[in-house]
């Protein structure tokens, strides 16, 4: 419950963060399909004997090359099978958290028997779409998710429609907390972070707890491309400096290594993405530790990072050709800059430099290599902060960067929302040809 004296706008900010910053086990695109399959299985009369699934091209892109936690296998078919046979239909993005060894074995057997199919939905106008249909003999149940990773819009069985979401908001119904972000500014977000009671935002410390645990697991060197562990090793060999810059990159990329490599630990996600949550969290945590920040100061920095990342991503399609680790790292740059000197000018300069640096990075699907992009984005964020502290930034005379940070963000998001759609189609075409 909110303090009744809390600024209504601040309440909306907090609700937006609570809506967008959630625990997630496994990459969220295959997990979205696993959730659809789990909910469908819960509606089915009898055990699942066969699974059919259809997904949007973008969801297919982000599900082709990523490891599903606990399985050692990559791709959407194993996600759909395990969701149907071992998923918790009530757990949202943690749908696979209770999957047993037997359920994993059964899912692999179903896959080996050719009883699982995943196809691209055609035609499909949705960026994020997943539909799972499970069968027991002639009986079936089908669940459709559209728009958001857990946004179930339809449940039906052979007996008829069980649930359908209304397409439009009922008159008088409260708007989504995210809607307010289209009418706010970074300056207003900073004022909120500086003045909101600590008790109202203490919950954001959970992002540090979850993502630090994931980072520690990644440093074991067992997961993905083990970038974090490799860089740490090179520090010991004297090939990389043992300093704050290295620590930011090592600990952030290690969390992504574990995430993308299939570790059975949840990430605290941001905007429906574990890697975005990691990128918005870990650089801020490392800098906070360096300066000996207490819990309140860490919470305010994390809130600025996560809310700024949501604010920017809210101007983008849910999935696009733009690697959103870059926009999450813009949030991290804001959080780190706030920890060092707290000035709006430093924060805005750091974000502008980020837009001038990494804005062209493409998303070519979720995979172990995401940790490379996460490490690059984290490094760029700290570099941008260091430049801003010296009163240096990419200016409005250069490229897509404008003299005003809000316009710079709008320019970047326009590029991703419009021109990069063709890039997205080309990426999907290339990846589909590899999968044949």
Curated annotation (Swiss-Prot):
<dbReference type="GO" id="GO:0080146">
    <property type="term" value="F:L-cysteine desulfhydrase activity"/>
</dbReference>
<dbReference type="InterPro" id="IPR005130">
    <property type="entry name" value="Ser_deHydtase-like_asu"/>
</dbReference>
<comment type="similarity">
    <text>Belongs to the UPF0597 family.</text>
</comment>
<dbReference type="Pfam" id="PF03313">
    <property type="entry name" value="SDH_alpha"/>
</dbReference>
<dbReference type="GO" id="GO:0019450">
    <property type="term" value="P:L-cysteine catabolic process to pyruvate"/>
</dbReference>
<dbReference type="InterPro" id="IPR021144">
    <property type="entry name" value="UPF0597"/>
</dbReference>
<protein>
    <recommendedName>
        <fullName>UPF0597 protein YhaM</fullName>
    </recommendedName>
</protein>
């Amino acid at each position: 419950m909110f303090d009744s004296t809390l600024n209504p706008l601040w309440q909306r900010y907090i609700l937006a963060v609570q809506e967008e910053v959630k625990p997630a086990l496994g990459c969220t695109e295959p997990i979205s399909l696993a959730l659809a399959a789990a909910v469908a299985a819960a509606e089915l009369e009898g055990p699942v004997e066969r699974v059919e699934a259809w997904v949007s091209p973008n969801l297919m892109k982000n599900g082709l090359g990523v490891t599903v936690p606990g399985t050692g296998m990559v791709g959407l078919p194993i996600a759909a099978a395990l969701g149907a046979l071992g998923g918790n239909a009530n757990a949202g993005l943690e749908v696979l958290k209770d999957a047993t060894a037997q359920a994993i074995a059964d899912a692999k057997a179903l896959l080996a028997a050719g009883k699982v199919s995943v196809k691209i939905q055609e035609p499909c106008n949705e960026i994020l779409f997943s539909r799972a249909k499970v069968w027991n003999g002639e009986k079936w149940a089908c669940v459709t998710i559209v728009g958001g990773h857990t946004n179930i819009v339809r449940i039906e069985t052979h007996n008829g429609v069980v649930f359908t979401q209304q397409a439009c908001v009922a008159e008088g119904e409260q708007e989504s907390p995210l809607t307010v972000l289209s009418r706010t500014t970074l300056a207003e977000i900073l004022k909120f972070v500086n003045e909101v009671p600590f008790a109202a935002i203490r919950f954001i410390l959970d992002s540090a707890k979850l993502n630090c645990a994931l980072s520690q697991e990644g440093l074991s060197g067992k997961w993905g491309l083990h970038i974090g562990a490799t860089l740490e090793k090179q520090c010991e060999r004297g090939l990389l400096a043992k300093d704050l810059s290295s620590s930011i990159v090592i600990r952030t990329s290690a969390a992504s290594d574990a995430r993308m490599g299939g570790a059975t630990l949840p990430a605290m996600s941001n905007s429906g993405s574990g890697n975005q949550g990691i990128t918005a969290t870990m650089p801020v945590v490392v800098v906070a530790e360096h300066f000996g920040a207490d819990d309140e100061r860490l919470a305010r920095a994390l809130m600025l990072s996560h809310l700024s990342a949501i604010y920017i991503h809210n101007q983008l399609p849910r999935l696009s050709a733009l690697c959103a680790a870059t926009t999450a790292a813009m949030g991290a740059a804001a959080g780190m800059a706030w920890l060092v000197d707290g000035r709006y000018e430093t924060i805005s300069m750091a974000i502008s430099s980020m837009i001038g640096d990494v804005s062209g990075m493409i998303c070519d699907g979720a995979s172990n290599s995401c940790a490379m992009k996460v490490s690059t984005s984290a490094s760029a964020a700290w570099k941008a902060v260091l430049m801003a502290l010296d009163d240096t930034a990419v200016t409005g005379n250069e490229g897509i960067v404008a003299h005003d940070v809000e316009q710079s963000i709008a320019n970047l998001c326009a590029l991703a929302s419009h021109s990069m759609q063709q890039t997205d189609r080309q990426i999907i075409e290339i990846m589909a040809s590899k999968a044949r």
